[in-house]
């Protein structure tokens, strides 16, 4: 496989982040905890997303060598290029009688976590504290609702 590919490193079971980096790949942090949203089954708080950074992984797979602990790679590793939220809507239909309600719930979960992701990926060193980012989100979300609802 060409090393020109950018890979999403997520579960740290099949291929671990250190092995991908050692093999020369550039990676995007797609850590299960706290970056996955499986509405309404599994998700982590906006504050947990804020406290995460692109050099930390917390897998959920029971056979991961990093289960129940945080894997950290060296800060400023140039081949870790960012992170992402991951929303899996496959549990919505089974958990919401009205599909539109489930989609709306997932949209809110993503929206309130996106600013926390941005603070961690646009700024490798946080520029604002959690309370400030949360307040800014609440202000812009209120404006969005006034416009769209």
Can you annotate each of these PLM segments?
Residues 1-149:
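Flexible, acidic glycine-rich loops studded with aromatic residues
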């Amino acid at each position: 496989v060409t090393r020109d590919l950018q890979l999403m490193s997520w579960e740290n079971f099949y291929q671990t982040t250190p092995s991908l980096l050692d093999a020369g790949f550039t990676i995007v942090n797609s850590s299960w905890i706290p970056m996955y949203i499986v509405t309404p089954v599994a998700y982590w708080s906006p504050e947990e997303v804020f406290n995460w950074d692109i050099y930390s992984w917390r897998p959920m797979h029971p056979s991961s060598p990093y289960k129940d602990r945080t894997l950290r790679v060296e800060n400023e590793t140039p081949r870790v290029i960012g992170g992402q939220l991951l929303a899996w809507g496959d549990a919505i239909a089974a958990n919401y009688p009205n599909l539109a309600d489930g989609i709306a719930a997932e949209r809110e979960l993503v929206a309130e976590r996106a600013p926390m992701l941005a603070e961690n990926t646009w700024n490798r060193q946080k520029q604002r504290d959690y309370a400030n980012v949360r307040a800014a989100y609440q202000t812009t979300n209120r404006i969005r609702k006034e416009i769209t609802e």
